[in-house]
């Protein structure tokens, strides 16, 4: 099993690479790519960790050597959000980076499962899909927007509020991966109930958690370590699915039946072809239903922005 991390010298990429080096199954290969010249050194550094995961690093303009034979490709390349930046500022830089890297994936390992971490995910996943389509290799079961960070944040914040163990809480999060498009289904946690006030405050905290980190880091970065953990969790689940493990379920931003929007974060069962099954989002509370209806315009516009970036 070979996993490639593109953007491996960045804050998310290094954290993700460390977690994969320590947690991928024995005999796996990990390849790191970044434009930054330090990348082969990051691989050497990680190679000293005693696990049976072979690691190699590649720098420069061409990601091809890192991508050859990859089963899973995780893309975290791009600029991070700084205080005062909004998503459109990010988009202007990151859209081109994602396009360029996905073009190389389409050429070199078109059958790989692709996880997009680079923000704004609502839009960059649409860009990736259109690039793959143009190359004639798009398979909607093999492209994922990584929204796992919303899930792990929800698990943490619910556990804190209710005095539970975070590892025993699993909150499905649907919609998208920014602001109001992030919708934690707090009504679906067995044995946990919330007041209306708690629901509103908790939902808002989960939606704005990225900004919480950006502000706390005071200009020194965005959420890199928790995002690395979230991306590792999804990446390892993709690997487990490819290896034939049954009942591997994660929430991810995928192209579905278009009921709400072309791309939508929902629980999916993973397997040898990526998404084996898109699972029902279940019954929503009135609060959740209203939030879902209220976000769809924003989500659809985010998606359209990505489609137009490639097709215009």
UniProtKB/Swiss-Prot annotation:
Family annotation (Pfam families): Ldh_1_C (PF02866), Ldh_1_N (PF00056)
SUPFAM superfamilies: LDH C-terminal domain-like (SSF56327), NAD(P)-binding Rossmann-fold domains (SSF51735)
Disulfide bond positions: none
One of the record's GO molecular function terms: L-malate dehydrogenase (NAD+) activity
Residues binding NAD(+): 7-13, 34, 94, 117-119, 227
Protein family per UniProt: Belongs to the LDH/MDH superfamily. MDH type 1 family.
HAMAP family attached to this UniProt entry: Malate_dehydrog_1
Stated name of the protein: Malate dehydrogenase
Organism: Photorhabdus laumondii subsp. laumondii (strain DSM 15139 / CIP 105565 / TT01)
């Amino acid at each position: 099993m070979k996993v490639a991390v593109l953007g491996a010298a960045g804050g998310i990429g290094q954290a993700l690479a460390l977690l994969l080096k320590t947690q991928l199954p024995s005999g796996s290969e990990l390849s790191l790519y970044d434009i930054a010249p330090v990348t082969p050194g990051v691989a050497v550094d990680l190679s000293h960790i005693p696990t049976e995961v072979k690691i190699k690093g590649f720098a420069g303009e061409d990601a091809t050597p890192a991508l050859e034979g990859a089963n899973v490709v995780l893309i975290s390349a791009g600029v991070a959000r700084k205080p005062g930046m909004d998503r459109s500022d990010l988009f202007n830089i990151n859209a081109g980076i994602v396009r360029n890297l996905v073009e190389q994936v389409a050429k070199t390992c078109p059958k790989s499962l692709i996880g997009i971490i680079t923000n704004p995910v609502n839009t960059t996943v649409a860009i990736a899909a259109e690039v793959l389509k143009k190359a004639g290799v798009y398979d909607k079961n093999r492209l994922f927007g990584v929204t796992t960070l919303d899930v792990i944040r929800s698990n943490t914040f619910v556990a804190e509020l209710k005095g539970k163990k975070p590892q025993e809480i699993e909150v499905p999060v649907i919609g998208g991966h920014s602001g109001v498009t992030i919708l934690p289904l707090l009504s679906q946690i067995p044995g946990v109930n919330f007041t209306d006030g708690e629901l509103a405050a908790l939902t808002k905290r989960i939606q704005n958690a990225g900004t919480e980190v950006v502000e706390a880091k005071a200009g020194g970065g965005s959420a890199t370590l928790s995002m690395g953990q979230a991306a590792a969790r999804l990446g390892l689940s993709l690997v487990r699915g490819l290896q034939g493990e049954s009942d591997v379920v994660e929430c991810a931003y995928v192209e579905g039946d278009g009921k709400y929007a072309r791309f939508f974060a929902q629980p999916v069962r993973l397997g040898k072809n990526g998404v084996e099954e898109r699972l029902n989002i279940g019954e929503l509370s009135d609060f959740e239903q209203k939030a879902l209806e209220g976000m769809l315009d924003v989500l659809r516009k985010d998606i359209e922005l990505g489609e137009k970036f490639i097709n215009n």
